């Protein structure tokens, strides 16, 4: 694997921006986040790429993060998706974002969730 800077993952930012675009939302529209947190660098990486402050009042996790909840691999993210789904159902029109890292910050998936269907 070759990257110009191992501390950054432009593909993660591209995935997040594209998911937001497809959902018709912006980062400011997101009411709840859960960012995959195997290690602090994974969280700081996506925060840096998106311009999201680590102390954002919306918090960066709903579950407490991988070290405290879940298991290895993206199984943790299934718990995050379930929690985001509960949150957006309780607040129709709101958006939630789940970011999931795989590999060595070389694969990143993003889901933007809402209880309200997208209007195309």
PLM region descriptions:
Residues 44-66:
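Flexible glycine/proline-rich, aromatic-decorated loop/lid segments
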Residues 3-7, 48-51, 111-114:
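Short secondary-structure boundary/capping segments
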């Amino acid at each position: 694997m070759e990257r110009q800077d191992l501390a950054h993952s432009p593909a993660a930012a591209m995935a997040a921006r594209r998911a937001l675009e497809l959902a018709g939302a912006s980062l400011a529209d997101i009411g709840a986040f859960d960012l995959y947190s195997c290690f602090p660098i994974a969280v700081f990486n996506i925060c840096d790429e998106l311009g999201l402050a680590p102390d954002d009042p919306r918090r960066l996790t709903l579950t407490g993060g991988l070290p405290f909840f879940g298991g290895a691999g993206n199984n943790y993210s299934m718990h995050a998706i379930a929690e985001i789904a509960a949150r957006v159902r309780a607040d129709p029109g709101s958006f939630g974002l789940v970011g999931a890292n795989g590999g060595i910050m070389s694969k990143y998936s993003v889901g933007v969730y809402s209880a309200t269907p997208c209007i195309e």
